[in-house]
């Protein structure tokens, strides 16, 4: 298995699909990475030589991925919460942030129902 950005990339998949195993790399970005590295999208990872894998590593290194991206997202949310803005308050209360209704629905964000005591 090839190791890129600290992730074991599956050998038996095509390069474009295999790169999506990295957090922060989707189909569009993986196509751009393959194009920049000069690798065909339909080539499987096991068929690449070490120089091509190294060029993939170099191209992936230009983007914020994996732990750095997770840390950046959590720091952005923490900053909103520290500012005390509306979005930060919604994050702090574990409610939907983007204007969705909460009278009904929103169960994923709110968690399981809490029993009402009479």
From Swiss-Prot:
Gene behind the chain: rpsM
UniProt keyword list: Ribonucleoprotein, Ribosomal protein, RNA-binding, rRNA-binding, tRNA-binding
GO cellular component: cytosol; small ribosomal subunit
Higher taxonomy: Bacteria, Pseudomonadati, Pseudomonadota, Gammaproteobacteria, Aeromonadales
Protein's name in the database: Small ribosomal subunit protein uS13
Record function comment: Located at the top of the head of the 30S subunit, it contacts several helices of the 16S rRNA. In the 70S ribosome it contacts the 23S rRNA (bridge B1a) and protein L5 of the 50S subunit (bridge B1b), connecting the 2 subunits; these bridges are implicated in subunit movement. Contacts the tRNAs in the A and P-sites.
GO biological process: translation
Top-rank taxon: Bacteria
PANTHER family listed in its UniProt record: 30S RIBOSOMAL PROTEIN S13/40S RIBOSOMAL PROTEIN S18, SMALL RIBOSOMAL SUBUNIT PROTEIN US13M
An annotated Gene Ontology molecular function: rRNA binding
Spans annotated as Disordered: 94-118
